[in-house]
């Protein structure tokens, strides 16, 4: 963290020195949580209370912080808990740069500027994740996770169980079926 903090500090200082501070959008985020190496008998990092880590679709692998700086446009020190996905970066940057979102092409991400600027809460949405054998769907407080294609999905309530330890699939078949159907529809759409 010290090296990262120092490196980002140098970039920000150079932007200040060159007079580009107010014209530059700085985004820092990670694409995954810390690598755990449990499969090699090592636990070299901790994402607690989140489950597991990088290259998984458990919260420890996909719930990561993002820091965005754009003086004059985004209020410094604002903390926003709205979930974002890397696909949101392109439409958000287009909007921040004053450009129109393409009408002839569907973007998978959404413009998150209203949420980032604390102007409005983002519309409820469904997030889909696929990595190797892992599949996951998140809608609101619920998250569906499948470790392998031939295994059943597990259902978690992230508001009550951020560590993803209690599978609610049998107790909440309605939500399970809704999210499974959403995943099947998304999978079909992606394949087309």
Where do the protein language model's features map onto the residues?
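Conserved hydrophobic/amphipathic secondary-structure segments
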Residues: 58-59, 70
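Short glycine- and hydrophobic/aromatic-rich loop-to-beta-strand nucleating segment
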Residues: 66-68
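C-terminal cap/loop subdomain of S1 sulfatases and analogous C-terminal strand-loop tails that border
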Residues: 34-57, 74-78, 82, 87-158, ...
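Intrinsically disordered, low-complexity polar regions and short flexible loop motifs
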Residues: 161
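Residue-level signal for the nucleotide or nucleotide-sugar donor/cofactor binding architecture
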Residues: 2-3, 84
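Metal-dependent active-site segment of extracytoplasmic phospho-/sulfohydrolases and closely related
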Residues: 3-42
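Non-transmembrane alpha-helical segments in soluble domains
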Residues: 5, 9-12, 16, 90-94, ...
């Amino acid at each position: 963290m010290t090296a990262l903090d120092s490196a980002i500090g140098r970039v920000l200082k150079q932007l200040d020195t060159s007079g580009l501070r107010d014209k530059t959008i700085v985004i820092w985020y990670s694409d995954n949580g810390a690598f755990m190496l449990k499969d090699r008998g090592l636990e070299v990092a901790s994402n607690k209370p989140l489950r597991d880590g990088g290259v998984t679709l458990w919260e420890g692998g996909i719930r990561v912080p993002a820091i965005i700086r754009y003086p004059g446009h985004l209020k410094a020190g604002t903390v926003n808990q709205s979930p974002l996905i890397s696909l949101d970066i392109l439409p958000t940057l287009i909007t921040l740069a004053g450009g129109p979102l393409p009408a002839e092409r569907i973007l998978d991400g959404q413009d998150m500027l209203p949420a980032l600027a604390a102007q409005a809460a983002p519309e409820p949405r469904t997030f889909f994740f696929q990595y190797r054998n892992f599949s996951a769907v998140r809608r609101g407080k619920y998250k569906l996770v499948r470790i392998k294609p031939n295994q059943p999905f597990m259902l978690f309530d992230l508001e009550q169980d951020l560590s993803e330890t209690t599978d609610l699939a049998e107790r909440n078949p309605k939500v399970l079926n809704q999210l499974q159907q959403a995943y099947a529809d998304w999978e079909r759409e992606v394949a087309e």
